[in-house]
């Protein structure tokens, strides 16, 4: 199994993001929200939205992105073929790395279940 985070596993264009924002299933916490939408590919893809308004410092934004990408990279083979967008909230920077990963795992699992309706 390959655990890299190649270009094909990323949302790259504004159209990709728009389609997820338009019709998405949500899983959220006080620290961040994950939006998910089925895609027509055979693998999941990840997009990140980390506004400067929410996390002020570049160090904080980069940490958020790094931890989220690493979690996605490790879980990619157990995730369904969906496009995921992770949106940061202010309180995300207060989480320890361990708590951040636990919360991400919980939300990945919630979004991996078949949708009802």
From Swiss-Prot:
It catalyses: Endonucleolytic cleavage of RNA, removing 5'-extranucleotides from tRNA precursor. SUPFAM superfamilies: Ribosomal protein S5 domain 2-like. Keywords: Endonuclease, Hydrolase, Nuclease, RNA-binding, tRNA processing. Consists of a catalytic RNA component (M1 or rnpB) and a protein subunit. This is Ribonuclease P protein component. Transmembrane segments: none annotated. Pfam families: Ribonuclease_P. PANTHER family: RIBONUCLEASE P PROTEIN COMPONENT (PTHR33992:SF1). Belongs to the RnpA family. The gene is rnpA. It is an enzyme of class 3 (hydrolase). InterPro entries: Ribosomal_Su5_D2-typ_SF, Ribsml_uS5_D2-typ_fold_subgr, RNase_P, RNase_P_CS. It comes from Aliivibrio salmonicida (strain LFI1238) (Vibrio salmonicida (strain LFI1238)). The keyword Nuclease applies. Signal peptide: none annotated. It comes from the Bacteria. RNaseP catalyzes the removal of the 5'-leader sequence from pre-tRNA to produce the mature 5'-terminus. It can also cleave other RNA substrates such as 4.5S RNA. The protein component plays an auxiliary but essential role in vivo by binding to the 5'-leader sequence and broadening the substrate specificity of the ribozyme. One of its GO terms (molecular function) is ribonuclease P activity.
